[in-house]
Regions:
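Generic secondary-structure boundary/loop-capping signal
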Residues: 7, 35, 74-76, 103
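A generic local structural motif
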Residues: 19-21, 66, 111-114
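A short, N-terminal amphipathic alpha-helix
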Residues: 25-29, 70-71, 119
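Poly-acidic low-complexity segments
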Residues: 5, 72, 82-85, 129, ...
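Active-site neighborhoods of divalent-metal-dependent phosphate/nucleic-acid chemistry enzymes
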Residues: 77-130, 134
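Short flexible/disordered coil segments
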Residues: 2-8, 93-104, 135-146
């Protein structure tokens, strides 16, 4: 199973116009979805931001977060812990992205998530975030959806 960025992962827990595509991608996989330990915190923020923006119904954020967190606790999702190996890979990723021509202006959290994926030797990335996808391509990951 590919590494799931939060931009795609959230579609498994709240209904969005393209959620079915991501649910099917997860369903077809032979292994568990893999996420970063940091995704746990980002997911809470993303869900509340969507609720605030009225992209999801009121009182949905906490319910969706509980479902997600239960999946983390029950090992439905494979968790990559944050550690020194991820931090060192992050440093390398920042250099690669900002030395590339054209530059890929990666954000800190995206770099940490990509470092988690690469440290865990994940060859594939599921993301809807354009910067994350660009950085993933630069780093040699296969990007889904294509």
């Amino acid at each position: 199973m590919p590494f799931w960025d939060t931009s795609a992962l959230v579609k498994l827990y709240v209904r969005e116009h393209d959620s079915d595509r991501f649910v099917e991608l997860a369903r077809r996989s032979e292994t568990r979805a893999t996420i970063s330990q940091l995704s746990i915190h980002e997911m809470r923020c993303v869900l509340h931001r969507k609720e605030f923006a009225r992209a999801i119904p009121p009182n949905t954020a906490e319910l969706a977060y509980r479902e997600f967190y239960n999946d983390v606790q029950d090992a439905v999702l494979k968790l990559i812990p944050y550690g020194r190996d991820v931090a060192l890979e992050f440093d390398r990723i920042v250099r690669v992205c900002y030395r590339a021509r054209p530059v890929v202006p990666i954000r800190a959290l995206d770099g940490l998530l990509l470092a988690s994926a690469l440290t865990a030797r994940m060859p594939d990335l599921v993301s809807t975030d354009l910067r994350m996808r660009d950085a993933g391509l630069l780093l040699g990951l296969r990007i889904f959806p294509s």
